[in-house]
Amino acid sequence: MANVVVTGEALDKSIREVVRILEDAVGCTAGPKGLTVAISKPYGSPEITKDGYKVMKSIKPEEPLAVAIANIITQSASQCNDKVGDGTTTCSILTAKVIEEVSRAKAAGADTISIKNGILKAKEAVLTALLSMKREVASEDEIAQVATISANGDKNIGGKIAQCVREVGKDGVITVEESKGFKDLEVERTDGMQFDRGYLSPYFVTNAEKMLVEFENPYIFLTEKKINLVQSILPVLENVARSGRPLLIIAEDVEGEALSTLVLNKLRGGLQVAAVKAPGFGDRRKDMLGDIAVIAGAKYVVNDELAVKVEDITLDDLGTAKTVRITKDTTTIIGSVDSNADSITSRISQIKSQIEVSSSDYDKEKLKERLAKLSGGVAVLKVGGSSEVEVKERKDRVEDALHATRAAVEEGVVPGGGAALLYTLASLDGIKGKNDDEQLGINIIKRAVCAPIKRIIKNSGSEEAPCVIQHLMKQNDKELIFNVDTMNYANAFASGVMDPLKVVRIAFDLAVSLAAVFMTLNAVVVDVPSKEDTAGGGAAGGMGGMGGF
């Protein structure tokens, strides 16, 4: 391999080309009339999706420079996906527009730093203007409307998500999984709990695409102690390994030799295992482990006071669950198989009694948090269909709608269909740059905030975007939007065309920040195959699809 440094016009041209390719592929999915994208797989049938992030991740250019640029953009999109689970398409459209405008300005000889200062100044004004337009989401109908919009107008998905929120509360745990039946969508409420602790090592991951640990019917081992040596829990590991089922370890910590041994065992294809830290601290950790034990039906939480030794613990003494899902930040236990409603009800009554007698506001608050986790349960949205392709496409839409709903409940909603960003134009009129190039940066953002609504209207098959923008900007009602479903103007909140503020805000913020990175990017160092590498790879010629290996 040899290193090549790419600079100047060659670099700018590559950036423009990669951004255009990504925006063309991702942008076509925007809006209720957006199109789907087929992603080919090495094995099996192609995946059909409208998930912008999934489309972006699947694009892998051949040229090393294009790969480097695409990776920078995809990493930014992944931040948007991690923070709100939605908004990747909007982020892509905005990024493409800003970079396109900046490239023109640079070609005309404008000062990059001044442009950047103008863009960042305009960014703050746009974010402030978005906050002034927000409305809180209160009713079940509004929740259903937000979910419906994010699910590309599928009212069934919107209604089911609203049902889940009603059953487990706005802060409750809602998960999505594939159904084995043919029903489009069904809701199942079950016992369960989620807490804010993720896997202790990414090597535990079983779903590499989503960076998740997913276990079906696992055993759960609970301990208040630190696990430094695998020898201390070896009897439990051996018993579970013989059963052929996965194991989740919840402990104060798992570190050193114990963690490395568990990881090595997993990588070698042995026991399916994952370890997470127990939630809380001190006495609160002890109480929360007790709550998890009740949910999972575990007989013991191992500690120094327990008379039973680890080697005496049988499989019947461990907790169980139907499903466990672990991300880098959270652990969700769904549907304990063995726990019964009586033990959970008894635990809930005990916590309620503690709340009544507690004189500390802080203690009461923490007890109420525990009560909510125990009593809320988990709502499971089961997605079905007549084919694997259909199920996966629908599941993507359900997950996007669920993320959008959570964001809407958290920060409120703004007018949808790209109207909220369009209405921030008024806030930019009063901002003046220190010089012509800084003003150019402000004007670039003015053009960028019009890009999402233009793309949504274009995807509907209409060429009326300029007329729509002109009409919306001439009137004073910031709740008026253009509904591409009906091709008419309507009130955003009455018609249900709303976007979560958090999604719009983060998508815009990340898009501008990403564009700012490319603005000051002067060189990219890439590895390119040397002649010797090419000759060596060619020795295996004739092996179609092997990529030279």
From Swiss-Prot:
The keyword NADP does not apply. This is Chaperonin GroEL. CDD domains: GroEL. Its EC number is 5.6.1.7. Its main location: cytoplasm. It is an enzyme of class 5 (isomerase). Belongs to the chaperonin (HSP60) family. It is found in: Cytoplasm. Together with its co-chaperonin GroES, plays an essential role in assisting protein folding. The GroEL-GroES system forms a nano-cage that allows encapsulation of the non-native substrate proteins and provides a physical environment optimized to promote and accelerate protein folding. It catalyses: ATP + H2O + a folded polypeptide = ADP + phosphate + an unfolded polypeptide. GO terms for cellular component: cytoplasm. Keywords: ATP-binding, Chaperone, Cytoplasm, Isomerase, Nucleotide-binding.
